[in-house]
Amino acid sequence: MSTPESKHFAIAIDGPAASGKSTVARLLAQRLGLVMVNSGAMYRAVTWKALGEHLDPHDSAAVANLLRHIRIECGHDGTRSTITIDGVDPSDELRSEQVNANVSAISAIPEVRDALIGLQRGYTQHSNVVMEGRDIGSVVFPDTPYKIYIDAAEEIRAARRKAAGEVDSIASRDAADSSRQTAPLVVAPGATRLDTSNLTIDGAVDAAIEILRHQGLKA
């Protein structure tokens, strides 16, 4: 259903930074008994590795060369996806200020996207997944019937970011994600919008499940 070779399906959850998509995707996966995959964590992991190697995140050739010499392994622990680079789990570093400031540049490199999209699609060879990101419904799984675009007002997203102790510019991140040439942030064809600005977490998850039911998911 997700790709011609897939044995399982994917629920695509897309949206801008701090829209609530990660929380909704995680709780959806728990409620439905599916594996949750945070595609953004993959890009953050590559960003973390590139910064650790003192590479310029805007030097696409250097970052592409790095990808050829590192081992990225993806899996899952129950309903949670996992990622290691050269055997190291970088989870604790993925939300650092440095990674926040540079992940958009890394994500815009075509070689990075090509490598990680292959890993993302690989999850459906073994599991039904809820995958969240910025191009899941438009690029990674364009044929899935289950697509939600989660959004919220910019000021609310900025407040959420601040409450989480993260320092970056929502406006700058939105501009970078929406204007990049490779897989920009868009509302995928067939996706239903969900505005979480005035919803509780449980309310957002309930709304997402209702959308998926309308899209044909038997949940």
Task: Give the label of every model feature segment.
Residues 91-163:
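ATP-dependent NMP and nucleoside kinases share a basic, alpha-helical "lid"
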Residues 1-10:
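Extreme N-terminal, non-catalytic leader segments
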Residues 24:
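Hydrophobic positions on the alpha1 helix immediately C-terminal to the Walker A/P-loop
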